[in-house]
Regions:
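Juxtamembrane regions of bacterial inner-membrane/periplasmic proteins
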Residues: 2-260
Length: 260
């Protein structure tokens, strides 16, 4: 009798796991071809604005295919956020270890932990499917969705979705909406300067402004421009389809040299 109960419990557990996997995996697989109408972060921000009584809040989200986006925009966000994006499977473990060490040093000095190591794939996972905040549960789900995305989407699709769901201002999502809002031009016409400025606010697009850059944003923009040159500019996007070993020149080599 007791064995029958255990078998039934195990069977229901396996069924529950299978159902949970299907419910979470199907949207990820579908979004390889279907453009997302909304993201979890957009929904959370809209709900927060409603609770706060922000009656004039508006979500500005305009999808643009990768071919309709300046290659400078893709290179800028890769240079700013995840220079080894073409070469990893969603997680940059060396950057994670460096971030842990850096934040431990900051903690000893009683300073805030300021360094993160989220890859572009991880940011897509949390922006699309999860909620803001920090917890072990959310980080576990983020890792799960990141792995699903990397297994089912090509790199070109990951960067395309990222460029469309990343936040560049209060209620402004995606490079098309940001380009139209801040530069009065379509994303296809963004130059290196505009793209680097937009990428410079990504750590905190509410505090930092594309149209009113602080000293920090200006310095970060200039750093991103230098990194874009070191990566080889738009030619670096060829690595998304046919990744090779990172060359020994440019920004990637300098980072790799520090890691060894």
């Amino acid at each position: 009798m007791k064995n029958n109960w255990r078998r039934r419990l195990a069977r229901w557990f396996l069924i529950a796991v299978a159902v949970a996997f299907l419910i979470t995996a199907l949207p990820v697989v579908a979004m390889r071809w279907m453009d997302p109408w909304y993201s979890a972060f957009m929904m959370d921000a809209a709900l927060d604005a409603s609770r706060s009584g922000k009656t004039h809040y508006h979500t500005d989200y305009r999808w643009a295919d990768l071919e309709q986006i300046s290659p400078h925009a893709a290179v800028a966000v890769i240079a700013a956020e995840d220079q080894f994006f073409p070469f990893h499977m969603g997680f940059d473990f060396k950057s994670i270890r460096e971030a842990v060490r850096s934040n431990e040093k900051q903690a000893k000095r009683k300073r805030p932990k300021v360094r993160g190591a989220s890859t572009i794939s991880q940011q897509v996972a949390k922006n699309l499917f999860l909620w803001p905040g920090r917890s072990y549960v959310r980080k576990g789900l983020e890792a799960y969705f990141t792995l699903l995305i990397e297994l089912t989407w090509p790199k070109e699709r990951i960067i395309e979705v990222y460029l469309n769901v990343a936040q560049f201002g209060d209620g402004v999502y995606g490079v098309e909406a940001a380009a139209q809002r801040f530069y009065k031009m379509p994303a296809a016409r963004l130059g290196r300067y505009e793209a680097a400025t937009m990428a410079a606010v990504l750590p905190n697009p509410i505090t930092f402004k594309v149209n009113a850059p602080s000293n920090y944003v200006v310095k970060r923009r200039d750093w991103i421009l230098a990194q874009m040159r070191g990566l080889g500019g738009a030619a670096y996007l060829d690595e998304l389809e046919n990744p090779t070993e990172p060359p020994k020149t440019g920004a990637r080599a300098r980072i790799e040299a520090k890691r060894k």
